[in-house]
């Protein structure tokens, strides 16, 4: 077996930016079994007195997710937030047109805020700009963030929440460019309502940050024109523009599939260019950052979802079971987000529990980790600090849709406070190991703490509630001498090489 070689230089002064911890965010929508039967299952042996599953809470805490987007998603475009507050017995059952389900409203924003506190996350709250508009948006900010002395803040207090929730980050609707969206709008229609909603929301609470909707994915016919038009209307009043993108391996072409993170990289660069064009056009001193608030692999469950009966409570929708190659692509996508730490400040793995998720649950049964759980956990836990620009020389390959795909996808993160450097690396090679030589000349007296590897001989291998064949091991061979790290990256592997001060 031939071993290819790649080299990399990491230098503590080659800084991209401090990584905003919110890029390791996630998403919970009122969809399928994400809420009901996911985070919330009264009567489950692991449920607390409020019905929240403690086993799920522990798995989420292990991921150290700093921010969670809620309550949607397509769901939010038909959602009346008032339905989910106040006495539970008085809450209406509603038809959710987005997912053709019945919403009981047993869980609403106050219960979700309680749960988010338990897992140590802040909430990225979305407002409904589909069936509703600026009035409901300002009232929701008042209910959540105003201390007291007004109708909606006093209503929150009457509901048992004396202290305001102080939600900092808000989404101005969801995927309004999509014809599937409840209340779909043109770019001009959406740009106008988003601008007016942004103004009144910030008048209620000037400390909040706002995310305006970009395109639902890069293949939308209105992509780029949508962003330019929407930002033209909203630039002075918003802080972020959103990106959404999901990938799948429908053609069963692993080499091409693992190169899709290059498309993600190009998507990010394109949106940065559009935002900066509007900045130049407006002669603005303000820079708009990016919120990649839906990203993941999503394709396994597409056919099964067509067979689900409509108008039931918490049907098993979007329950992708992820395999090993999915974990590798998720790793490449995480590295791509880190590489753009200067502009991507928020990102949400969509979603968190049961719905295209790293965590799965069974009714009255266990919770378990999917293959994609591990790269996400490693990135979140060890990817805090400054992203360093990697100078890489790697052998390359061509695939169906891409040319010059590097076998090595890698980045290093420097945590000055902990005096640690973490190298994240994916070897895309399907046949051979890759010998990595990494020059760490600016890091004196460092040693290898550990070399974590996620590998498997079968790219289609999945985990289940009964067994977890795809799990990382700590038997990587990384060594450091003469300020050079050398490591073997097994074929098709996700690697985390942690360096610390002696």
Curated annotation (Swiss-Prot):
Alphabetized UniProt keyword annotations: Carbohydrate metabolism, Cytoplasm, Glycosidase, Hydrolase
One GO CC term, this protein: cytoplasm
Effect of mutating residue 294 to A: Abolishes catalytic activity, but the binding affinity shows only a small change
Quaternary structure note: Homohexamer; trimer of dimers.
Secreted recorded as keyword: no
Chief location category: cytoplasm
High-level lineage: Bacteria, Bacillati, Bacillota, Bacilli, Bacillales
Pfam families xref list: Alpha-L-AF_C
UniProt pH dependence: Optimum pH is 5.5-6.0.
Active-site residues, Swiss-Prot/TrEMBL: 175, 294
Extent of the signal sequence: none
Protein task: Involved in the degradation of arabinan and is a key enzyme in the complete degradation of the plant cell wall. Catalyzes the cleavage of terminal alpha-(1->5)-arabinofuranosyl bonds in different hemicellulosic homopolysaccharides (branched and debranched arabinans). It acts preferentially on aryl-alpha-L-arabinofuranosides, and is much less effective on aryl-beta-D-xylopyranosides.
Natural source organism: Geobacillus stearothermophilus
Molecular function per GO: alpha-L-arabinofuranosidase activity
Binding site for alpha-L-arabinofuranose: 29, 74, 174, 246, 294, 351
Family of this protein: Belongs to the glycosyl hydrolase 51 family.
Activity over temperature: Optimum temperature is 70 degrees Celsius.
InterPro entries: Alpha-L-AF_C, Glyco_hydro_b, Glycoside_hydrolase_SF
Induction: Transcription is repressed by glucose and by the binding of AraR to the operon promoter. L-arabinose acts as an inducer by inhibiting the binding of AraR to the DNA, thus allowing expression of the gene.
UniProt-annotated location(s): Cytoplasm
Gene Ontology terms: biological process: arabinan catabolic process; L-arabinose metabolic process
Residues the UniProt record annotates as site (Important for substrate recognition): 298, 351
Pathway(s) this gene product operates in, as recorded in its UniProt entry: Glycan metabolism; L-arabinan degradation
Regulation: Strongly inhibited by Hg(2+).
EC primary class: hydrolase
EC numbers on record: 3.2.1.55
Name under which the protein is recorded: Intracellular exo-alpha-(1->5)-L-arabinofuranosidase
Record's catalysed reaction(s): Hydrolysis of terminal non-reducing alpha-L-arabinofuranoside residues in alpha-L-arabinosides
């Amino acid at each position: 077996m031939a071993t290819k070689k790649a080299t990399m230089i990491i230098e503590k002064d080659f800084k991209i930016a401090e990584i905003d911890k919110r890029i390791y965010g996630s998403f919970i929508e009122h969809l399928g079994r994400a809420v009901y039967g996911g985070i919330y299952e009264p009567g489950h042996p692991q449920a607390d007195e409020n019905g929240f599953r403690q086993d799920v809470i522990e798995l989420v805490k292990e991921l150290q997710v700093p921010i969670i987007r809620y309550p949607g998603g397509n769901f939010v475009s038909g959602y009346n937030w008032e339905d989910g507050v106040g006495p539970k017995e008085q809450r209406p059952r509603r038809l959710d047109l987005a997912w053709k389900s019945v919403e009981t409203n047993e869980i609403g924003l106050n219960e979700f805020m309680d749960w988010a506190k338990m897992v140590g996350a802040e909430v990225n709250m979305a407002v409904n700009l589909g069936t509703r508009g600026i009035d409901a948006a300002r009232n929701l900010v008042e209910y959540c963030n105003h201390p007291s002395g007004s109708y909606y803040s006093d209503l929150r207090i009457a509901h048992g929440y004396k202290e305001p929730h102080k939600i900092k980050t808000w989404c101005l609707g969801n995927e309004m460019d999509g014809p599937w969206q409840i209340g779909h709008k043109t770019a001009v229609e959406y740009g106008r309502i988003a601008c007016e909603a942004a103004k009144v929301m910030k008048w209620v609470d000037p400390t909040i940050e706002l995310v305006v909707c970009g395109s639902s994915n890069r293949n939308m016919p209105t992509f780029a024109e949508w962003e330019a038009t929407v930002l033209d209307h909203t630039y002075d009043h918003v802080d972020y523009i959103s990106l959404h993108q999901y990938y799948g391996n429908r053609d069963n072409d692993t080499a091409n599939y693992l190169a899709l993170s290059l498309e993600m990289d190009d998507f990010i660069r394109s949106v940065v260019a559009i935002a900066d064009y509007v900045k130049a056009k407006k002669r603005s001193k303000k820079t708009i950052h990016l919120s990649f608030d839906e990203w993941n692999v999503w394709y396994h469950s597409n056919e099964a979802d067509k067979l689900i009966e409509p108008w039931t409570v918490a049907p098993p929708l979007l329950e992708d079971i992820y395999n090993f190659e999915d974990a590798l692509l998720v790793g490449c996508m995480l590295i791509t987000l880190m590489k753009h730490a200067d502009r991507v400040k928020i990102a949400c793995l969509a979603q968190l529990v049961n719905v295209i998720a790293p965590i799965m649950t069974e009714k009255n049964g266990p919770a378990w980790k999917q293959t994609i759980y591990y790269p996400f956990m490693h990135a979140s836990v060890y990817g805090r600090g400054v992203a360093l620009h990697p100078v890489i020389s790697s052998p390359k390959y061509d695939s169906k849709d891409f040319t010059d795909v590097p076998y090595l996808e890698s980045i290093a993160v420097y945590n000055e406070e902990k005096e640690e450097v973490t190298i994240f690396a994916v070897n895309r090679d399907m046949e051979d190991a890759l010998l990595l030589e990494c020059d760490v000349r600016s890091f004196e007296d460092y040693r290898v703490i550990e070399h974590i590897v996620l590998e498997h001989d079968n790219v289609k291998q999945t985990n289940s509630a009964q067994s977890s064949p795809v799990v990382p091991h700590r038997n990587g061979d990384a060594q450091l001498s003469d300020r050079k790290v050398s490591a073997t990256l097994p074929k098709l592997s996700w690697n985390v090489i942690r360096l610390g001060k002696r």
